[in-house]
Amino acid sequence: MISVNLTTMHSRLDLCAATVWSIINQSVQPDKINLWISNEPYLSDHGIYEIPAWVEELNKINNIVNVHYVKNTGPYRKIINAIINSEIDDILVYADDDVIYGRQWLEFLLGQFYENNCNVAIAARIRIMERNIFNKYKSYSSYSISMKKDKFEKDFIITGVGGCVLSKRMIKPSIIGDDAYLIISPKTDDIWISKMLEASNTKVESSPDALRCVHEILHGYNTLSSINTLTSKNNGLIIKAIRMVKNKFYSYFGL
C-alpha cells in the first residue's frame, strides 16, 4: 500500500486543504492520504477539535483522505505514526502541509524508489552537511541542496518540504520506539528522521525531478518545524540540535 502522510494545526487547515488537493490530483495516485492531527495543544498547535469540512469535499473527488487523531507530538505525527502502524513493505511518503505539489511529484519519487528496488529512501530535497577547514560543521544556511541524483550514507538532512519515500523496514525497530525526540529535538523532525535512517544504515537518494514539482506556499502562519527555515541568527541552534541528535544515536549504538 502507498500512503502519503501529513500533519497540520488549526491555524494552517486552509493551507493543508490546498496541499491535499494537489496530492489528490497527482498523475500517480496513492492508496491513502493520512492526515495525523490532535485535539490537545502542543508547542504552537492549539489542537483541532473537529474534522475540517474540506475532508468530506475532497473525498468526493477521490475517497482516499483519512483523518487520524493521535497524541500531539508536533511535526513527528506525520511519519512516526505512519511507520508504527504500517506493514513492513508498505510504501510511506511524508509531506508538508503548506506546499502545492506539482502533478508529477509523486510519480517522480516513486519511480526513483522502484529504480532502487525499494531499498533506498528517496527525498526531493536534501541538504548536504559540509565542514570547514577546521573540520567543524558549517552553518545550516550554508549547506547546499543536492541538485542531482546523489546517494548519501551520512552527513545529509532531508527537508520535509520536498517529501520523502521510505518503508518501515528501512529503520531499525529499536529506533522506531524511541521517543527521545520529544526532549532532544521537538521541532527539528527533519534532523531526527535523517539520523534515524543514517543510524539504520539506510541510504538516501535525492530527486531533482521531484524537487522541481515542489511549490511552497508563502504565508505568515506558525510553522510546525520553524527551526528548519530559520534565518542565520539561529544557525547555532540548528548545529546544536544536529549535534544532540547525532550524539543520541552514537551513544545508543556504542559508537
Which residues make up each language-model segment?
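Conserved catalytic core of nucleotide-sugar-dependent glycosyltransferases
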Residues: 82, 102-178
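C-terminal catalytic/acceptor-binding lobe
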Residues: 1, 15-19, 180-255
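Short, acidic, metal-binding catalytic loop of nucleotide-sugar glycosyltransferases
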Residues: 19-31, 39-43
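Short beta-strand-to-loop acidic/aromatic patch adjacent to the donor-nucleotide binding site
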Residues: 89-98
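Short internal beta-strands
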Residues: 34-38, 123
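Active-site-proximal specificity loops/subdomain of glycosyltransferases
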Residues: 38-90
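A conserved hydrophobic helix/loop-capping motif in glycosyltransferases and polysaccharide synthases
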Residues: 3-11, 26
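Residues at the starts of beta-strands that form the adenosine-phosphate
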Residues: 1, 31-32, 91, 203
